[in-house]
Structures are given as structure tokens and as C-alpha cells.
Amino acid sequence: ISIEKTTGEVFIATENGLVSFISGGTSTQGDLSKVYAYPNPVRPEYDVLGYSNLNNINKGVKLKGLTDNVNIKITDVVGNLVGEAQSNVNYRSSSKNFAIDGGTAIWNGKNLSNNIVATGVYLFLISDLSTFETKTIKVLIVR
């Protein structure tokens, strides 16, 4: 078994040949210096917001380049908490609106009340719980 670190594609060698699938997760990084969000800005025609199933890797707002022990809070510009996830706690299979899978986090654009967020700027406040390194990423949602 091998994982392509940048795309998250998993390769499995069997006696009948090689099989691969896109997992959606990626390898973790050593620090937060290369974290980025996409799509950004999030435009209506991208059709990535509001889905309840985070297992569809083509939907949602993603953060890539995370370390292996992070806590991420999403707030609006006023400071209202919109979402929160922690490594090794909030998995994509956990039926949450925000989850972390290895070096990738995925958010479906819903707030803590399970409503799709309004147009605006949202802050992803990333904290590495091991090194105390922090980083803030801004994402613009246009509805």
C-alpha cells in the first residue's frame, strides 16, 4: 500500500495487479507554512456548499498542508464560532460539518446550527497542538 502525498491517491498492489482510489486525505506536513484553502473565493457556480456527506471529496471547502495534531476553528469576521474540528477526533465519517483527514480538512459550508453560511469572509484559525504554531486563513464565500 502506498499513498501519493499531494493528491491522497491510495495505491494497493495485489497478486492480480494494481488498484488505486482517491481518498481525499493527504499526508500531514511538518509545519503550517504551506497551508492553503480552496476553492477561494467560493463562488455559487462551484456548487460545493451545503452537502451533508463529507465523503464526497469534490464538494466542500478544503484546507491542505495541515500538521498531524491541529485544532481548527472557523469564525466569521465578527468572531462568531461557525465550526470547529480537531485531528484524530472529527473524521469525515463522523457526520459533522467540518472534519480533518490527515493533512486535509473539509468544511461543507454549514454553521453549528446546520445552516449554510451567508456571503462573507470566514477565518480558519489553525493551531498546532504539539508545537503551538498558529496560522489564519481567510476564505471568501459568495452566495
Where are these regions (language model features)?
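Glycine-centered tight-turn motifs at strand-turn-strand junctions
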Residues: V78-V117, D128-T131
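Residue-level detector of Asp-centered blade-edge/turn motifs that repeat once per structural unit
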Residues: I3-T7
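Conserved beta-propeller blade signature
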Residues: E9-I12
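Short, glycine-anchored, charge-dense loop/turn motifs used at functional sites
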Residues: V70-V82, Y122
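Short loop/turn segments immediately following beta-strands, especially the blade-tip
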Residues: F21-D31
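C-terminal tail/sorting-segment detector
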Residues: V121-R143
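Glycine-centered coil/turn sites that cap beta-strands in beta-rich domains
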Residues: D31-K73, S130
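Short loop/turn segments immediately following the C-termini of beta-strands
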Residues: E15
